[in-house]
A protein has these predicted regions:
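A short hydrophobic/small-residue beta-strand
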Residues: 59, 131-132
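A short glycine-rich, Lys/Arg-flanked "PGG" loop and its adjoining helix->strand segment in the class I
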Residues: 115-127
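Helix-loop segment at the mouth of the active site in Rossmann-fold oxidoreductases
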Residues: 90-92, 109, 141
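Short catalytic micro-motifs in class I SAM-dependent methyltransferases
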Residues: 104-108
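Conserved class I S-adenosyl-L-methionine
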Residues: 132-154
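Short glycine-centered segments of the SAM/dcSAM-binding site in methyltransferase folds
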Residues: 37, 128-130
Length: 232
């Protein structure tokens, strides 16, 4: 399965698919400080970059989609701060960023690419710099399998390659970083739904805080990990 084809569609013709991400992205931007140099890996609709820019953050962007990068360069005047490329081979210098954001990215990567990508994050972060991000929580990958009607190939509708729980995410990050937090968190677009759905969301949030309830959209693992030293 070609991940680039899937993401070229969602970031361009299918950009409306990111409309439910605002609560998550606003939360992530609140963790960043004005004046910090921050790299966002995986631009989606460009909403995080826009939110960060309004807060006075020196925001940079990396994404494999050249069309998505061109759009964000033009819309936010990012110039060379927005680059087309891959997380396992970042076109940025060593010790360059105060923080790197990877929200809903790691689940799209094969195991070896995930490890190489985290090594690259470590390389481009300053000492004490933070990796901040999210992945879907305890996703059942088979629930989102679809079949191509033309060729019969079966694949995950969003291109996910891996599912994570808190122990698995902790183990993954420990290889490169000092962990500050790894926990489940529930995001919900309160302003865009009626009272009935708000009540349902509150119930799901309560159950999620206790590791119970349903899986699905808005239920994530949130993580923060810090670069403590240079690799030996």
């Amino acid at each position: 399965m070609n991940q680039d084809i899937i993401w070229a569609h969602f970031q361009n013709e299918g950009v409306a698919s990111f409309s439910g991400a605002t609560a998550r992205l606003e939360f992530l931007v609140r963790q960043l400080r004005p004046g910090e140099r921050v790299l966002n890996v995986g631009v989606g609709s460009g909403e995080l970059e826009a939110l960060a820019q309004r807060k006075g953050i020196d925001i940079w962007a990396l994404d494999p989609g050249e069309r998505a990068i061109e759009k964000i360069r033009n819309h936010l005047s990012l110039g060379e701060r927005a680059q087309a490329g891959y997380s396992q081979q970042m076109p940025f210098p060593d010790v360059h960023f105060d923080a790197v954001v990877m929200s809903e990215v790691l689940e799209h990567l094969d195991a070896d690419i995930r490890l190489r990508s985290l090594a690259e994050v470590h390389r481009v972060l300053k000492i004490g710099g933070r990796l901040i991000g999210t992945v879907p929580a305890r996703e059942r990958l088979s629930d989102s399998d679809v079949v191509c009607p033309s060729c019969g190939h079966q694949f995950h509708r969003w291109g996910h390659k891996a599912a994570f729980d808190v122990p698995a995410m902790t183990k993954l990050l420990k290889g490169e970083f000092a962990i500050e937090t790894v926990h489940e968190r529930f995001f919900n677009e309160w302003d865009s739904v009626g009272w009935g759905r708000r009540a349902t969301g509150l119930i799901k949030k309560f159950l999620s805080s206790r590791g119970l309830g349903t899986y699905g959209a808005a239920r994530n693992i949130y993580f923060v990990a810090r670069k403590a030293t240079e690799p030996s």
